[in-house]
Amino acid sequence: MKTGILFTSRNNYDLLDYWLKNVNTEGLFILNIDEDSTPENKIKGKEVCEKHCIAYMDREDRGMQNNITSACNIFKKSNLEWIIWFQHDCFPITNKFFTKFNELVETGKLDNFGSVGFNIKHDGVYQMLSRTPLQQPNRDMWNRFDINTPLPLEYNKVHSVESVSWMCAAVNINQYLKEIIPTGEYQFFHAWDDIAFQFMYKNIHNICIPFLELSHEQIIKKDFNMPVKSPLAKTEEETKKREHYYGKWGHHKVWESRWGFSYDDNSTFEEVKENYSGTLIDKFYNHNLNTGPLQIFEL
């Protein structure tokens, strides 16, 4: 196997234990990086990892991107080439999911891509193929389809995306270490979007593999007394609970300061579009989702 699995955990080890009990990881190496859990949760995390024979480490530097850098350096020593990262409430549903992905890795056909996303069956409602902050039309900032209808033919093929649906995301270790400048400013939210945009700025495609499917089951967090909708916090108590699991907020401001436009309003890209001329970022901004993918790949 040339693929490994990464978890980044913060005070959510009961959910990690549930995931590991219910998923056949097909013999892949698994690393869990703790993101400043409380002392009692660190103890629980070490116990869960030992129970399931997976590696545990405390973070080196804070934030998702720095954790991925740590994982890349560790995985590379074992000659692994790709990392698959999971949110703890996202579960593979394609039979032999990991084997099928690894077979693609071993063909070498993924070598030139940056990040890879999949078809995420979200809360039993949508098939979420990618995140689309720039493409037109921009109503939802997702490329998504009803879960009960077949995907349109053009989107049923491996295709280029702006940013992956990062309930589960894979990253090319060599490309990441070579091309990505990690920041600790994003502790969780928007970290993967920033990675995808860094790749696009270098004209490296991110792709969706729609025939590899997973189920994102947010409701399961209710069984572990976690916020079901992780970004939502309307009261001081809800804000503290969100930070307990995900770290500091403020990722929208970080995004705007780094990229020059608002993630939630692609009209603001007009002011900075000249900075991205000749890049995939510019190509996606001028692309309409309704015409099909920007580019299709045969794997």
Predicted regions and their residues:
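Glycine-rich, basic loop-to-helix element that forms the pyrophosphate-binding segment
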Residues: 59-75
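A conserved acidic beta->alpha catalytic loop
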Residues: 32-45
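Donor nucleotide-sugar recognition loop
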Residues: 163-166, 178-201, 205-215
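Short, well-formed alpha-helical segments that are part of the catalytic scaffolds
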Residues: 11-25
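Conserved donor-nucleotide/metal-binding helix-loop-beta segment in metal-dependent transferases, i.e.
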Residues: 96-114
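Short beta-strand-to-loop acidic/aromatic patch adjacent to the donor-nucleotide binding site
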Residues: 80-91
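Short beta-strand-to-loop element that shapes/binds the nucleotide-sugar donor at the catalytic cleft/hinge
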Residues: 114-133
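A recurrent flexible, glycine/aromatic-enriched loop bordering the glycosyltransferase active site
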Residues: 149-171
